[in-house]
Amino acid sequence: MSSARERLEGAQVWVVKIGSALLTRDGVGIDARGIDGWCKQISALLDDGKRVALVTSGAVAEGFRRLGFTERPDSIHELQAAAAVGQMGIVQAYEKSFRHHSRRTALVLLTHDDLSDRQRYLNARGTLRTLLNYGIVPIINENDSVATDEIQLGDNDTLAARVASLVSADVLVLLTDQEGLHEDDPRVRPDAPMVSERSAFDSKLDDMVGSGTGALGRGGMVTKLEASRYAARAGCHTVIANGREQDILSAIANGRNVGTILTADVAPLDARKQWIAAQVQNAGGITLDAGAVKAVMERGVSVLAVGVTDVHGNFGRGDVVRITGPDGVEVGKGLVNYGAVETDLIKGHGSEAIEEMLGYVDEEELIHCDNLALSQ
């Protein structure tokens, strides 16, 4: 067993994405038996102490079937209507199946904008992590009934990768109607060897995936590779596997050589901090006293309001701010939980005083250590 497969055995936070072709039996209708099987396997993962978020496709495809569409319509409003109709069937099927295993579920509808806007990102992050901590299975889909570009792209693979980053997942599982990633299109070349394990950033993979897409789900292997790279930047491994294979999730959890594993190059926390440090512009900054700088640098703790001496700029909740010490030297960057006005009010005060001063408490930390990228 490879070291990457061994790490899957210890994965605690999972994001599982099920594609349209699987859920709707290639457009015939909702695969109730398949859903029962996946829900049973997810329930088993929960029994083992794992936390699992489920990203589902299939709403638009199921809507096509219910509305009698034989071809994908060009009208965005027809697509939105199909999504609204199909979503009902998908959610009801999951709820019914999970109920058989005494599992609670929650519906979370997102658009990519929700994850790009830092304030909404923090709200989504907090909600999803709370659900996972309570042992609830979040059933996540794009809000296709109001979205536009998301429907046209059909990019739930990318949504799943963003969710994996959002909840600091250890593994992202993309269940599809293929055994994994092959060196060539298996529908054209049936004997094409399957890739067992590669780095997500292996450039040879680009030539292998080509540009093909399925008829029902718009995201083929190209988007799955792109999604794996997004997840890898957050330190999350990706497994592409055949959702129709019996007990496929259990096999992955046990480290069996199934599907294709695309590995991340860094650990999750390091990847998150690299992303914060390198890719997001600073909206402002805060200055820490010497004691706070020492605690953050030496012990890796969160930034608390009590250690802040000055506030710079006009940043909002969820923005990236530059953190400096009393000498002006940069300590790091981080995603801040309070805006500049609120931070200025609570600076120098302990966490217990936040509610009294603001009238509410979002987070006890000004910047959580998970969202803090140190410069030294």
Segments from the language model and where they lie:
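C-terminal catalytic "cap/lid" subdomain
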Residues: 1-376
